[in-house]
Amino acid sequence: MNRKMVAVVTAAGLATASCYARAKWVRPEIGTGGDGHTFPGATYPFGLVQPSPDTGRESYRYCAGYRYEDSRIFGFSQTHLSGTGCGDLGDLRLMPFTGAASAEVSSAFRKETQVCEPGYYAVTLDDFGVRAEASAAPHCAVYRFAFPKGEASLLVDCMWGIGGKEITKTILGSDARVEGNRVLGTTRRRYWVTRQYSFVVEFDHPVKSWEKLPAAEGEKAPRFVLKFDLSDGSPLVVKVGYSLVGVDGAEKNLAAELPDFGFDRIRAAAAAEWDRTLSRMEIEGSDTEKVNFFSAMYRLFIQPNNIADVDGRYRGADGEVHNAQGGVYYSTLSLWDTFRAYHPLATLIAADKEDGFVETILEHQRAAGFMPIWTLMGKDNQCMIGTHSIPVVVDWFLKTEALTRDAAPADADKSSVHSRDRAFWEAAYAAIKDSLTKLHKGRKLEDWPALDKYGYYPNDIVTSESVSRLLENCFDDWCAAKMAAKLGHAEDAAFFEKRSRNWRNVVDPETGFVRGRDTNGNWTTPFNPLALGRNAGTGSDYTEGNAWQWTWHVLNEPEALIEAVGGKERAGERIVNLFTLKADESETGTCEDVTGLMGQYCHGNEPSHHVIYLLPYVGRTARQAELVRAVFDEFYVAKPDGLCGNDDCGQMSAWYLFSAMGFYPLNPASGEYVLGAPQLPKVTIKLEKTVGVGEGTDKIHSPTQTRDSNYFRVVAKNLSKENKYVKSVTLNGKPLEGFTIRHEDIVKGGELVFEMTDRP
């Protein structure tokens, strides 16, 4: 394809995007450079597939399979993770080419030939003169490959996958085969989890001939090269049905979503669905602000992914096939990250989805026997610390309880499929209690007997991350205590409330830092509060951070933490110093997840995300306003390397969206948001209000269907580069007392107005 044709195609792509008021602002390439670990390919909101180019696959750099700075594409795989710190997926590689067949086929490409839009990706493969386009449906991918006239070839590679230097050890086997005009089969893989995926690939042109490439030693899955006669100059359209259940599931998905080869129809449908999804919020601001805002929303809604087929079947945590209630079962739950801001934000702008996330979490528990930690394709990889599906469930329970406690019976829709009766929540609480008191098979991250005996995790028993584990578990315990109290389990509530305060046992009064201790109560010595820990097996008391960062991780008791480290004045100085204290690598060591540093504050990793919102507790709101602005200016930039760290399945984006509005859930299960300093003149949330399903003790705390839609507006009057400080705040015309706002006040609708000034 010549340069003139490329320009025409690119212009056509931009014209399509401009038809949609919000999707046109999205730049999927943001985060594909640097440490963002995003990908540029086609997506569908919460969809199972993400057809996207792969420029690499074997290291931390390639968690999403693509680096903006690369110049060669190895093919297009069907599934990708967005913003994670560990790579996986990259299932089923397709690569169009001409000439000699090879498993190593790749092509140079130029960034100026790329078109990246919600639901669409295109690029020119320069080595072959092929224009490649991709789009997505909820469970299927579709491609259009425009070849030079003549014979065209397509590599279908079942030995491909992201993650691991030795792919032969991760692909366990495949029964993939060519049948007529289709390639189909099931491939088994083991990397982050052990799983299987099934697929059906169909073509709009007959297969002229095909061959199976020779397998290298140890390879257990085939690669096929198929040839097509495109002498008439028409493009080759390829559609891919995908399923975790089986080939029959992939066939059903394909028949339901891609009954024909209408590429443009699928592309338009994906763009329209993205625009509808992004319409949950509106903003006023500059073009650059709109790009940053709607790109953050886009990254938010790439996942979790609905892994249930069109008939509702899914493969669960136990490896068995189940039927999903309402036809949805979500995976890619990066809960150590997303419990902090993603899920609280979803309760405001995607309440319908949050209810499904909670249902999925509890279905997972019923199959696996414990609450999930980090789910991928229906399985739990148990990555990271804590059990943060617990705050997600408890937050939803407490918020819907607050909304429904005064609901009249006449408001109830008792036929709603989303009705949650007391039995549902009692079962949820029982699952939470089990997960916080019993060790389950394959789960060795916590030692409950040691915790209950010592009141902390002795680092000669729990030899890695003992302090971080304690702090995270204290928050889970606090959540359990609140749910137990609401359900009337007073004894349990007292137990979990007491245990949630154990963080006090690792605050060293002499240094003012959280610090590891052994079974004799001795503090970790020597002690360097700047030294970075990594993950399990490293021997550090901290997870992906140091004592400077983790000392502030008491989400459930910020006031008590401030007193424990010396009171408001000392704590305030310490927090302010956190953002200016610089240290040499010789003092800190290294950790690849510790990025986006501002002093010792680490915006590129989640444990620091709430710290700016501690500043009102110590009377430092002016400094808070300065820091929010600095983070926006430095760490959220509308370019490929514009994210300062892994987007972590939308958590980094959720921080941006909350902070743009001027509030943030410091305690993400409290139903309370701490005020900050808004960064946009106006943000409007289109609300979905939920109501209860009945009176009495049998039907309580129940989110149901959408009652009506209304709006909550956040206005920042006189906001400018200079006017970054908050002078006053009103809610619906009345002065807002304190520095927090309740969830129920937001979802009632109304207007939050910040008067901005240039004076601290």
What are these regions (language model features)?
Residues 1-7:
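Bacterial N-terminal signal peptides that target proteins for export
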Residues 476:
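ATP-dependent phospho-/nucleotidyl transfer catalytic cores
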Residues 20-391, 397-402, 418-471, 479-505, ...:
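Accessory carbohydrate-recognition regions in carbohydrate-active enzymes
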Residues 527-531, 696-699, 705, 709:
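Charged/polar low-complexity intrinsically disordered segments
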Residues 405-415, 419, 694, 698:
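Short, low-complexity, charge-dense intrinsically disordered segments
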Residues 18, 415-419, 702, 709:
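Serine residues within intrinsically disordered or low-complexity segments
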Residues 11-19:
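Hydrophobic h-region of N-terminal signal peptides that target proteins for export
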